[in-house]
């Protein structure tokens, strides 16, 4: 199983910290999984101009091809101005409409206050649904108060991250079995 984590901003440290924790949990629980972090702060991405993602070069091509090859994607995003960051939106714009077909996508969100939790429901989930993702219904929402010196200090957040990883992997396994059963119906 190939899992790609996306740290969806090119500024700040909280989302990257949360993604590091989450992917470490995934590595410990599922050592056979191929797990990669794409921290968008570490890549020089160009803005989407409507081309097919395979026509781009450099970091843009690397990032989009890694996402397209994944079985599961864990998106980490901060909330900026009550919305997703432009760097993450650009990733969605670079990919085809059906980019997440047969992929499981889960989310964790960092925000300054609890008032921004609806961003996931009203913006991120509709984008992922439009792109045909199998969305893990629950997500991890982490507030400013849950961090101290680039560490997560809320044990409940760690527990929810563990559950998010488990739900993501279980959903991938379930969809693999469903597709195999569906394919077995055809006798050619």
Regions found by a protein language model. Name each.
Residues 11-15, 81, 113-116, 150:
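Alpha-helix N-cap/loop-to-helix initiation residues
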Residues 25, 29-30, 101, 106-188:
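FMN-binding flavodoxin-like domain, especially the glycine-rich phosphate-binding loop
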